[in-house]
Amino acid sequence: MSYDYHQNWGRDGGPRSSGGGYGGSYGGSHGGGHGGNRGSGGGGGGGGGRGGRGRHPGHLKGREIGLWYAKKQGQKNKEAERQERAVVHMDERREEQIVQLLHSVQTKNDKDEEAQISWFAPEDHGYGTEAPAENKPNSVKNVEHQEKKMINQEKRPFRIRDKYIDRDSEYLLQENEPDATLDQQLLEDLQKKKTDLRYIEMQRFREKLPSYGMQKELVNMIDNHQVTVISGETGCGKTTQVTQFILDNYIERGKGSACRIVCTQPRRISAISVAERVAAERAESCGNGNSTGYQIRLQSRLPRKQGSILYCTTGIILQWLQSDPHLSSVSHIVLDEIHERNLQSDVLMTVVKDLLSYRPDLKVVLMSATLNAEKFSEYFGNCPMIHIPGFTFPVVEYLLEDIIEKIRYVPEQKEHRSQFKKGFMQGHVNRQEKEEKEAIYKERWPGYLRELRQRYSASTVDVVEMMDDEKVDLNLIAALIRYIVLEEEDGAILVFLPGWDNISTLHDLLMSQVMFKSDKFIIIPLHSLMPTVNQTQVFKRTPPGVRKIVIATNIAETSITIDDVVYVIDGGKIKETHFDTQNNISTMSAEWVSKANAKQRKGRAGRVQPGHCYHLYNSLRASLLDDYQLPEILRTPLEELCLQIKILRLGGIAHFLSRLMDPPSNEAVLLSIKHLMELNALDKQEELTPLGVHLARLPVEPHIGKMILFGALFCCLDPVLTIAASLSFKDPFVIPLGKEKVADARRKELAKDTKSDHLTVVNAFKGWEKAKQRGFRYEKDYCWEYFLSSNTLQMLHNMKGQFAEHLLGAGFVSSRNPQDPESNINSDNEKIIKAVICAGLYPKVAKIRLNLGKKRKMVKVYTKTDGVVAIHPKSVNVEQTEFNYNWLIYHLKMRTSSIYLYDCTEVSPYCLLFFGGDISIQKDNDQETIAVDEWIIFQSPARIAHLVKELRKELDILLQEKIESPHPVDWKDTKSRDCAVLSAIIDLIKTQEKATPRNLPPRFQDGYYS
């Protein structure tokens, strides 16, 4: 439908024929229309009635008075909010240009009447240009569906087949044909090794491992069964030895070329360290075409293609499956550490289970800690199990009552706290089993205390009774460390705490004591926020007479091994993220450890000599701990996984997820599908849209993927890739203990006046690149000055390269260089980058309101679903009061003690109008408004609102075409529709000033605002 805008829309706002419609109301409310508007104001003034001067009417009593004042306050707040609304306006020159542009584009296209799908709103939130689907005849719906299906099939070659395949992918897709010459060569190499001194020395070590004595038994079981479960304690050698047993057995039988083993690891650090260890045991270097190598995201040292062992992260196999659904070149797949139950390994188990019938020759080995091996065997049709005994020294365990009795601990503050306030129901994790256990705990408490009095001193029982077990008692830990240092033998101490705050506080507590300030102690905090330079000290043995104290999160349970630990202090809590499907919010809280966690922690103490493990919970609590942590799939959003299921062609999302070992709830699955439909990544048949295909191929969650695509389309690629990498990995800032305030100040310095955590990371990254170009010393000084991790920055740099490869392969850019000038025409414009952030992260929007009722200026922040929320203390916006606009876009919202926005960026009205949800034009009494999803509301003259809405429609059409057939925008072709529409939108975003009633152009400043 084409408009002659000057014919249909008068300069004063409404259709010429509408008389008192838009035109009349515009004149009445803004053009000095004193009658209606002022009259209503006067009428409202008398509303106080008999109360006089705004007091309540005299006939009201009790609760009625309170309700009257509440209603009055609500009206006052609503009016204040109306007056604070930003005004969307444009000068006459731009208005004229956009009218001409729209007229030209719409005439040129002579658009067909088929409704366009909005990228930013659910399909049923159209712009009102098409009858709702439910009102259409079935025959019409069927024809439309078939047409769409045919279009999609025609475009499939573009979408499914990436143009670019990297070296690692080529390696993975290599065919595995038997090769007699290679078989002989591998056999000769293995025989030769047996005379190599390095190999012989390593062999002596291997022979001492419990797994080595079971070599024949293990190999026979794997040979004779398609699936085998191997369980074993830490230190038994299952991860390093089982793969070697299989490979050497094949080589010795003259079938080495037919053996290609892939072993998955849950973490990057373990994939690398295990591969390097196995290579060393085989007297080889890791990778370089030898027998053993690794592949993790953005890093690989690949082994030879046949007769080899590849250690890789679980995500690598899932990506591999996209190109080779049957893993046809793999002879053995070993899934290690499956007891951890992370999301990817649970999914891979189900995929592999389905694969067994297609690949009867494929051997599957599942490796787990001892505790739950039976469950995995049952899942794979009661396949055989074999157990390898552990190799640890005995460890003496102490529970809370033992510790208090042993060190005669008395809390400083003797305040009785309710034992039953939360108990097992830590945070907001509403699980029935937790509630049931809490009820049992409460019921058994009196009997437990009676039993304690028979075995422990009265003072110990009194302390146990008074302690608040919701909190980790850091004073008790400090006292226990002091006791170990003074009374026990030498040996490193490892303390497990739930999070950064506890680690930081305990460190300060120890350093406040003169004893720990001496050079006889090395205290090392171990956390992802800590600089990695400090953390390398963890692995170094200390000189005689020096005691190492490591304060860590659960990263020290399995990911790393600290050899010299003799004493473990188990704080009893672990930070867990959960997803509340009812309120659509992530929550993070300190939960009680599981029995499996406790066992792992205990095992850390007995690796080199007999050890001691101190658990900071009582024996009643110990008896009620869960066997394992809740599997990740039951406590995380599922959007990224749903896209993976579709790209791997695993069938219906709900059907596939229902077959997992622990299926997620229907609510969680439906919520994720709904979000993906709103994002236009899935259609109503739950099939991938063209956008969905691109998002599924990007190794990030969907909102970040969408941001990456927009960064390419709007030619601000480099900064947007920096933001995307940091959101999907982590930001590069570190917080050394004792330097928190200085670190915060440096971060704010990098923020400049952007009012954006995301642009702060961009500025930090740019500074690092410049420093790096000048040399290593400058890079080191820069990172030191601004509290940045050079390792993390390097990882972000590598990830940006990977994202650019994906974009090149899909056709969105013409170079794999993130800094290619053609992809960065708008990269210096902060407002355009903010618009792209908004395009990716919408609808994660928060509203800012200035709170003037306080003595000092403050802002309150709200979201649509949560009401009042808080900006996280680490955000650069936490103390900000001078915002240009009233809206923030954020990535992570999480409930801990409060609901926090962890990162946010201030965005302008045009960002939200062009890249937000469904647009509607409304009237709010005397105010003309334009709204996004009916809650983000701006003042706007009707003619401007209609121009914006039409321009937005053109943008949606253009974007849909770009996604279906990607190619870079040709900015030199200024006459092209693409260039004209995008340039007009960019121009509006770039030139938008702070648009509140205080700084409007003269034609807006009239009686309404004075």
From Swiss-Prot:
Residues 1-107 are annotated as: Required for the pre-miR-134 transport. Residues 843-907 are annotated as: OB-fold-like subdomains. One of its GO terms (molecular function) is single-stranded DNA binding. ATP binds at G235, C236, G237, K238, T239, T240, S559, R604, A605, G606, R607. Pfam families: DEAD, HA2_C, HA2_N, Helicase_C, OB_NTP_bind. Residues 56-108 are annotated as: Required for G4-DNA- and G4-RNA-binding. Residues 219-389 form the Helicase ATP-binding domain. Its EC number is 3.6.4.12, 3.6.4.13. A motif (DEAH box) lies at residues 336-339. ATPase activity is enhanced in the presence of homomeric poly(U) RNAs, but not by double-stranded DNA (dsDNA), double-stranded RNA (dsRNA) and tRNA. The modification Phosphoserine is found at S965. The DHX36-specific motif (DSM) form folds into a DNA-binding-induced alpha-helix that together with the oligonucleotide and oligosaccharide-binding-fold-like (OB-fold-like) subdomain bind to Myc-promoter G4-DNA-containing structure in an ATP-dependent manner. Upon G4-DNA-binding, DHX36 pulls on DSM in the 3'-direction, inducing rearrangement of the RecA-like 1 and 2 and the degenerate-winged-helix (WH) regions; these rearrangements are probably responsible for the ATP-independent repetitive G4-DNA unfolding activity, one residue at a time. Found in a multi-helicase-TICAM1 complex at least composed of DHX36, DDX1, DDX21 and TICAM1; this complex exists in resting cells with or without dsRNA poly(I:C) ligand stimulation. Interacts (via C-terminus) with TICAM1 (via TIR domain). Interacts (via C-terminus) with DDX21; this interaction serves as bridges to TICAM1. Interacts with TERT; this interaction is dependent on the ability of DHX36 to bind to the G-quadruplex RNA (G4-RNA) structure present in the telomerase RNA template component (TERC). PANTHER family: ATP-DEPENDENT DNA_RNA HELICASE DHX36, ATP-DEPENDENT RNA HELICASE. This is ATP-dependent DNA/RNA helicase DHX36. It comes from Bos taurus (Bovine).
